[in-house]
Design a protein with these regions (language model features):
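Glycine-rich active-site loop/strand segments that organize a redox cofactor
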Residues: 56-104
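Predominantly flavin-linked oxidoreductase catalytic cores and closely associated redox partners
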Residues: 51, 118-119, 123-201
Length: 201
C-alpha cells in the first residue's frame, strides 16, 4: 500500500522489518487482536528467509530440550522459558498448520519436506493478510521526528507514522543488500538506548 506524499498514518502497532522476526511479531499481534502494520525498505517480504531456503531452510533442530537450550550459552537461563513455549516441536506444528510438512535430517536438523522456503513464506503471508496484517513495502525507516513519530521514506514521498506500539525487527549487520545493514544502532543511540555491539552468530 502506498500513501500520499508528506502523509501521516496512525496505527495501533507497527512492525519495522519484514523478515521472520517481524512476521512472527505481526502474527503474535494479529492473534492478540491488534491491527499490525509491517513496514520494510525492500520491495518484497522475507528476502533473507528466501535466501536461506537455497540451502534447504533449516528451521530448527530436533535434539532434546536440555542440549538444545545449552547451545545458547550464557543466555540459556533467559531463553529456556521461551523455548518451552515455542521450541522445535512448536516450530514444526506451526509449519504444518501452514500446510508445510517437515522432516528431520540425519544431522537432527528440521527442514520443510520440499526443502524450499517460498511455499512456507507464501502460506505465512496469506495467513497474515487474512488476519488483517497490512504490509507497506519500499518504506525505509529513517528514525523518529521530534514528537516521537516514526519517519519513513517511500516511493511517493516521506511519511510520518504515529503508533501506540513499535516492534523493531531490523536484522543484524549482514547482507545489507537484503535490508540488514545495522543502521538502526545509530538511531537507537541517538535516543539514548544502550545496545550491545553486533557479533556474528
Amino acid at each position: 500500500s502506498h500513501l500520499a506524499p508528506a502523509s501521516a498514518l496512525a496505527c495501533d502497532a507497527v512492525v519495522i522489518g519484514a523478515g521472520p522476526a517481524g512476521l512472527m511479531a505481526a502474527q503474535a499481534l494479529a492473534q492478540a487482536g491488534v491491527a499490525a502494520h509491517v513496514f520494510d525498505a525492500m520491495p518484497s517480504v522475507g528476502r533473507k528467509f528466501l535466501l536461506a531456503g537455497k540451502g534447504g531452510l533449516n528451521l530448527t533442530h530436533a535434539e532434546p530440550p536440555e542440549p538444545f537450550v545449552s547451545r545458547y550459552g550464557a543466555r540459556q537461563t533467559q531463553l529456556a522459558p521461551l523455548l518451552e513455549q515455542f521450541g522445535a516441536p512448536q516450530v514444526r506444528s506451526w509449519a504444518q498448520d501452514l500446510g508445510v510438512e517437515t522432516f528431520i535430517g540425519t544431522s537432527g536438523r528440521v527442514f520443510p519436506a520440499d526443502m524450499k522456503a517460498a511455499p512456507l513464506l507464501r502460506a505465512w503471508l496469506q495467513r497474515l493478510r487474512s488476519q488483517g496484517v497490512q504490509f507497506h513495502m519500499r518504506h525505509r525507516f529513517t528514525g523518529w521526528d521530534g514528537a516521537g513519530a516514526l519517519q519513513f521514506q517511500a516511493p511517493s514521498g516521506d511519511i510520518t507514522v504515529q503508533a501506540r506500539a513499535v516492534v523493531l525487527a531490523l536484522g543484524g549487520g549482514s547482507w545489507a543488500r537484503l535490508g540488514s545493514d545495522g543502521a538502526w544502532l545509530a538511531w537507537l543511540a541517538q535516543r539514548g538506548v544502550t545496545t550491545a555491539p553486533l557479533q556474528p552468530s
